[in-house]
């Protein structure tokens, strides 16, 4: 019960960050039919059942996916090759792992070619926000941590994409 309450607080804090950045994403699903259809088979347990990230939506031609966890120690789990683990337990229990899972699932099951996934953990005082770029081939790249979502609103997202040189790293 206490964990659930902390998760809700984290969800609300992330919602506030999105609002401050003037980004409107949907919680636990999507109003966009194509995304909602894809999420019908996005269970993090790998069962093929429905699964929803905390927030998902579109800014320009970018699909944004956010998975959050209240505990900082549930931010990311790496495998023995120092890559983001895709094991079911890691995907279910860790913010970055879950965000990557949803981003790859959406890359496979929608027409979106540019996906920014965010693993968020902690709270207003102490937190981590880790963006990942995932393209339509499911290639992913970890990007530098950010403090807010301001770089990802309609006014700034193209500049962020260019500044982080994402295009160059994905064009072969």
Where in this protein do the model-derived segments appear?
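A short, conserved, highly charged catalytic patch centered on acidic carboxylates
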Residues: 1-116, 120-132
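Intrinsic-disorder-associated interaction segments
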Residues: 3, 7, 139-142, 150, ...
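Generic alpha-helical secondary structure signal
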Residues: 19, 106, 137, 164-165
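Generic alpha-helix signal with a bias toward terminal, lower-confidence helices
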Residues: 78, 132, 145, 161-164
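Glycine-rich loops and low-complexity Gly/Arg-rich segments
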Residues: 90-93, 141-146, 156-157
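Intrinsically disordered, low-complexity segments enriched in small/polar residues
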Residues: 100, 131, 138, 158-159
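Short, low-complexity, polybasic intrinsically disordered segments
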Residues: 123-152
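Non-catalytic nucleic-acid substrate-recognition regions in nucleic-acid-modifying enzymes
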Residues: 148-172
